[in-house]
């Protein structure tokens, strides 16, 4: 489901070596390609006109034969806790969201990789959208560039790169758009570009097992797995991808995931009241993760109207964490951020709304009647 049927090269989407080849083909010296690349990916230029030290003749030739992806900021919402959610409009009018999460020691951007999502997790608002299309590499990296520039305007940091960390946990399943993701990662990690550290970039997956090993072999970024259940029956009901790649297969892929010594896989566990938050779930989770260098992020469910799930009862998350810690599993409770602007985990949905199949699934799990 790739985007626009347009063969015009997008400068923002080109790997560094392909950009160099394109500019060499115009008869230019190699240093010109580096100049253009740094304007695109270090300074986040929104147009060719901004590239003031690039000869006008070259800019005009590039304008004739290429295009330059630049997202338009459609909305900006600021939370009381400092979180900012941006909705970006693409060239074909699609909307995607990214979220800025400021902390004392880091400034993180949660990045989207698709318009919508085909995975269909029943507790997630993005899943109600379905999948419209994949994002191009330039549309992925430009979320970072637009965010960096906006943060400088807001006085949230100094240029050219206030952001310190990236998490690919926004709209979409990153590994389902691996071609674009890999190019985007290379651009974002490049020394002539933003030069993010591998240690500060995390890619999340719902469990697309065949692509997980490829990610580990071809990059050194960190892996997060959206687990959310401790039995196949439970996970089948809330995450349909489990019917293709059940828990045993997923966890085997985690054990085999290529990692540098000292690294850990983060397991995201969204806690749904009355569904997956019982003491027995904590005990099963500890057993499942045995032998895997793991850290568990416990995420109290952010309630979404119409989806039918509820947050855990008071104290349930802390008790769950304590049970894991007692079984030698590193576990932390992730603080919900941006809930007042629908920017928290599972709340991103730039288009669409709740669907009946998700309400029915929630009702089946919780024993409550489905609305509608």
From Swiss-Prot:
Keyword annotations from UniProtKB, A to Z: 4Fe-4S, Cytoplasm, Disulfide bond, Iron, Iron-sulfur, Metal-binding, Methyltransferase, rRNA processing, S-adenosyl-L-methionine, Transferase, tRNA processing
UniProt: [4Fe-4S] cluster binding residues: 117, 121, 124
Pfam families: Radical_SAM (PF04055), RlmN_N (PF21016)
Annotated S-S bridges: 110-345
InterPro entries reported for this sequence: Aldolase_TIM, Methyltransferase_A, RlmN_N, RNA_MTrfase_RlmN, rRNA_lsu_MTrfase_RlmN/Cfr, rSAM
GO biological process, one term: rRNA base methylation
EC numbers for this chain: 2.1.1.192
A molecular function GO annotation: tRNA (adenine(37)-C2)-methyltransferase activity
Residues bound to S-adenosyl-L-methionine: 172-173, 204, 226-228, 302
Cofactor field: [4Fe-4S] cluster
Region Disordered, residue ranges: 350-372
Subcellular location: Cytoplasm
Family: Belongs to the radical SAM superfamily. RlmN family.
Other notes: Reaction proceeds by a ping-pong mechanism involving intermediate methylation of a conserved cysteine residue.
Descriptive protein name: Dual-specificity RNA methyltransferase RlmN
Lineage of the species this protein comes from: Bacteria, Pseudomonadati, Myxococcota, Myxococcia, Myxococcales
Gene this chain is encoded by: rlmN
